[in-house]
């Protein structure tokens, strides 16, 4: 055995309890991770690492989806960092388990089951490196059989007992405020949910909900203002509007006395939709015991905290479980759809509510990749670069829940008492 205390991975420091990572159920070792499956195969890769670290075959472990109550907080699944961040943590967990449970011989799983779940992984002794058996092999993806065979697996496939369908009617434009209808509006088979300019319907049958939403759209009257920039001249809007200056590197003006030629060019890109292959969805159930949420969020712990902040709840009463949906390359509307489901479920306590976005919802109200404009200039002298500058104008490139202290959930801006934003100073 060896003491690797000085080499404890960061994700172990933040989640030091053994039972947060590993347990045994029905004779199978369960491995909990905070990283989530977005279609990139990451859970299979982490399963390979975990199996080897525990000295078990891949078939001898069961991967458990990320869960705010029963699993580690590993932040966001983003930036191609999952193996880099979660892999060392799983290896450390396995090394502790092997040190405590002994050789992987007869009775090994039973000995793992008998381990103290409160064992501190940051101070426990560790076994030496495990043999690579699964890692390095092309193992079959754990998530693909259900997807290939069309078996229910995605969030939109969930049908818990008593579930209601829900839809949300978005304002026709940014900043629009709802004038009509009032809470007396009715349609067959549905219940109206209104909080300020947040407007939705819930019902037993999806067809009734969709019909009611169409009727509601026709009956609504909004107070609108033109708040969007000229899409044909985004570069000018970006360069002239209020902004923060963030110097990345500033070594002063270059010496141009020996520069013989200067090249300058500007480049721009518009706002871009992430455009997942299917729209986002969320499922929530509001009960006396607390709030349960099922989401395909890339960060279930930040989502839990954002929901609690937006509604004034104790985060300990909010439980978020990851369920796969359409994958994404960039921040899609998973978090916003989950919050929609929460607001709808709040109106019908005890009943689970599935809130599904439409394609128009996703393309008009989902998070967008920021527009950018840049100017690059380079001085040349004697065939060498004598000076170089690069200036970029853009909005921030993250608006995920909890960033800079704001819940960052779309419907929060539409409530009768909008969620306050933290103070920001323009420079």
Task: Name each region found by the language model.
Residues 1-427:
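Structural alpha/beta core scaffold segments of enzyme domains
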């Amino acid at each position: 055995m060896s003491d690797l205390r000085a080499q404890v991975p960061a994700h172990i420091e933040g989640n030091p309890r053994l039972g947060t990572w590993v347990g045994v159920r029905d004779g199978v070792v369960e491995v909990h991770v905070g990283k989530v499956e977005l279609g990139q195969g990451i859970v299979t890769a982490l399963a390979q690492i975990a199996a080897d670290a525990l000295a078990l075959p891949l078939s001898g472990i069961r991967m458990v989806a990320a869960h705010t109550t029963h699993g580690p907080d590993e932040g966001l699944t983003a930036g191609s960092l999952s193996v880099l961040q979660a892999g060392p943590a799983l290896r450390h967990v396995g090394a502790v388990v092997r040190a405590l449970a002994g050789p992987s011989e007869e009775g090994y799983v039973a000995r793992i089951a008998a381990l103290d779940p409160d064992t501190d992984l940051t101070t426990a002794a560790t076994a030496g490196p495990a043999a690579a058996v699964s890692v390095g092999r092309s193992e079959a993806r754990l998530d693909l059989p259900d997807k290939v065979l069309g078996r229910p697996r995605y969030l939109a496939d969930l049908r818990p007992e008593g579930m209601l369908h829900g839809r949300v009617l978005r304002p026709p434009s940014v900043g629009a405020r709802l004038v009509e209808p009032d809470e007396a509006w009715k349609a067959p088979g549905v219940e109206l949910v209104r909080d300020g300019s947040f407007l939705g319907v819930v019902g037993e049958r999806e067809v009734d909900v969709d019909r009611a939403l169409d009727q509601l759209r026709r009956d609504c009257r909004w107070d609108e203002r033109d708040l969007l920039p000229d899409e044909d001249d985004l570069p000018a809007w970006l360069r002239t509007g209020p902004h923060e200056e963030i110097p990345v590197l500033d070594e002063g003006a270059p010496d141009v006395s020996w520069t013989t030629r200067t090249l300058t060019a500007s480049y721009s890109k518009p706002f871009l939709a992430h455009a997942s292959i299917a729209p986002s969805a969320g499922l929530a159930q509001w009960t006396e015991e607390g709030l349960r949420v099922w989401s395909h969020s890339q960060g279930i712990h930040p989502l839990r905290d954002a929901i609690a902040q937006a509604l004034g709840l104790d985060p300990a009463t909010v439980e978020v479980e990851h369920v796969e949906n359409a994958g994404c390359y960039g921040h899609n509307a998973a978090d916003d759809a989950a919050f929609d489901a929460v607001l709808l479920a709040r109106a019908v306590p005890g009943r689970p509510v599935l809130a599904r976005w439409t394609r128009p919802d996703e393309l008009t109200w989902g998070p967008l990749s920021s527009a950018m404009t840049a100017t690059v200039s380079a001085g040349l002298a004697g065939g060498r670069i004598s000076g170089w500058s690069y200036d970029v104008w853009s909005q921030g490139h993250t608006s995920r829940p909890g960033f800079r202290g704001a819940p960052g959930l779309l419907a929060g801006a539409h409530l009768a008492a909008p969620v306050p934003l933290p103070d920001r100073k323009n420079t």
